[in-house]
From Swiss-Prot:
More about this protein: Most taste cells may be activated by a limited number of bitter compounds; individual taste cells can discriminate among bitter stimuli.
Glycosylation, residue list: N163
CDD domains referenced in this protein's UniProt entry, alphabetically: 7tm_TAS2R1
Family: Belongs to the G-protein coupled receptor T2R family.
Taxonomic lineage from the root: Eukaryota, Metazoa, Chordata, Craniata, Vertebrata
SUPFAM superfamilies for this protein: Family A G protein-coupled receptor-like (SSF81321)
Extracellular side of membrane: 1-9, 77-81, 146-178, 244-257
Protein name: Taste receptor type 2 member 1
A single GO molecular function term of this UniProt record: bitter taste receptor activity
Domain of life (superkingdom): Eukaryota
Subcellular location, record wording: Membrane
Amino acid sequence: MLESHLIIYFLLAVIQFLLGIFTNGIIVVVNGIDLIKHRKMAPLDLLLSCLAVSRIFLQLFIFYVNVIVIFFIEFIMCSANCAILLFVNELELWLATWLGVFYCAKVASVRHPLFIWLKMRISKLVPWMILGSLLYVSMICVFHSKYAGFMVPHFLRNFFSQNATIQKEDTLAIQIFSFVAEFSVPLLIFLVAVLLLIFSLGRHTRQMRNTVAGSRVPGRGAPISALLSILSFLILYFSHCMIKVFLSSLKFHVRRFIFLFFILVIGIYPSGHSLILILGNPKLKQNAKKFLLHSKCCQ
């Protein structure tokens, strides 16, 4: 018999899972229909579609972890499962990083020659960013598969083992290298891009307030809404990365509140940010409304 707090937690996990599948599914379906109609896809739509697909698989795994934790189902640790998990996790991280870089290049106003060069070519670089991410993540998975005998299972045992074990020095060294290669690099790129974008939008907002003080100008709130959207992206992305670091470096007893809280917060990112993307994109927002209205009419 499940305890009451576990039932509430599982209901929240189900809602989170359904929201993540719906929001990311909307992004994939809408951009897929546009691709069929026009036989081409805009760079941003391509990046969003790839990100949404990776988040769907990530959401599936997070829900699988929730089912394991709640119902004490045995987790089968094999190289294939570990490779799929690592591939989806790292690919989603890099695609989200490139989305932040894309927004920065398109919206931010910086006069540095390198930034101007990036601003003019960012659209053409998107397919290469995606391809480069696939190759890089594949290399990371090959590295993990080489040390899967003592590294990846140790990472997963942090979730589901009750007895703590002392890390070996070689395992710790590899985990440090893995952290730098997998988390630090994309996180640093993302922080630089998004903070630069936030400062640029903040400066633009202050300039608008000074020039049009006391007057009502159409679209005056657009920079503020964009700034709030980017800030929410930053908070979700950063908290997601930090919790992954905690879960991979510390041991938690299953069903403890802190462990359940961390897993729930991890699931908020792929569903919550996709919802923000839909609300901030007129095309996606309109199609999401049409889908909801059609669903109500069919009932």
